[in-house]
């Protein structure tokens, strides 16, 4: 498997998770679904500390955490949330590295940036997650 094929595993995984992610899903469930999807698409392992999917939401999306210290938070997605997913599939020692940020607004994944309600997101960034 070449680099582009491994990257495609990660891209397909993000495309998949965007169809199933919803409010009240636990970040740990999202990690599990992402890792299972990558394995089903041909990844044989995960190159970064054996973690296939780093999942962050809300204020956690602004921090940097070493894989050595990473623990997926036991946290639920809210109706208005921001989620960062960073994937690290590997196949036959070929690494992929693919990250995306997903916006949930009014319980729905926003697929195009122009569909984000600017006032709501501005409120998010100025007042914090709880008032979004």
PLM regions and their residue ranges:
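Active-site neighborhoods and metal-handling regions in enzymes and metal-associated proteins
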Residues: 1-132
């Amino acid at each position: 498997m070449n680099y582009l094929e491994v990257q495609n595993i990660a891209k397909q995984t993000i495309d998949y998770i965007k169809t199933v992610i919803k409010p009240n899903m636990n970040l740990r469930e999202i990690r599990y679904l992402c890792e299972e999807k990558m394995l089903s698409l041909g990844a044989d392992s995960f190159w970064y500390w054996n973690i296939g999917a780093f999942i962050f939401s809300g204020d956690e999306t602004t921090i940097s955490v070493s894989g050595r210290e990473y623990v997926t938070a036991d946290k639920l997605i809210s109706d208005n949330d921001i989620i960062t997913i960073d994937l690290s599939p590997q196949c036959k020692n070929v690494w992929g590295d693919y990250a995306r940020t997903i916006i949930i607004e009014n319980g729905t994944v926003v697929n195009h940036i122009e569909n984000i309600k600017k006032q709501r997101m501005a409120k998010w960034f100025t007042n914090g997650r709880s008032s979004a």
